[in-house]
Amino acid sequence: MALIHAKALREPPSPDSALAQAFDRIGEVVTREYAVVWRFLRRLGVPPSDVDDATHIALARTLARCERIAPDCERAYLMRTAYHLSFEYRRAARRSQDRAADIDVDQLETHESTPDAALQKQRDRELLDEALDQLPTELRAVLTLYELEGMTFTEIATVLEIPRGTVASRLRRARGELKKSVSRLRKGGC
């Protein structure tokens, strides 16, 4: 990243330059989408101990390529970068077998009115996370982006670089597999 912006650091771009405008445009998306990228990476299996670093790397890689990203494609580019980065982190985690305790960002942000409600919500989240972990990555990515992050089929197709019809079929398969997985887990099976 330092090489890409070395000239820009020596000679700051004028506020009207294409680089400055692209950097500002991408910077707004990066700021707005931080939590989305964090959750996406976590749900794609990036270990909890690495998810903050992976999020920052995805954001930095996107900013470093700001000149190459077309307007209105910033979010898709950022999510695609995060998607590809998740493979790197999962590969590294498999090699090191470092499995830390799961920390759910939503749990840190909410307070339940009763201990029973909080416990049930935590159990539901753990069940969902375990069921999601059983899905193949390509199904988990589509389901997470659509159901949990609210992206459209077109946006998902762009992020994952697959046809829109493939998004629909993977979503249908993912929902079916998730339903079966949740049912098995509730019955106490594997």
Question: Where are the language model's segments positioned?
Answer:
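Amphipathic, Lys/Arg- and hydrophobic-enriched alpha-helical face
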Residues: E28-P48, A64-R65, L132, R184
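Short helix-capping/turn signature of helix-turn-helix
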Residues: R32-Y34, R43-L44, T144-M151, E161
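Structural recognition of an alpha-helix C-terminal capping motif at a helix-to-coil junction
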Residues: D50-A60, A64, D72-H84
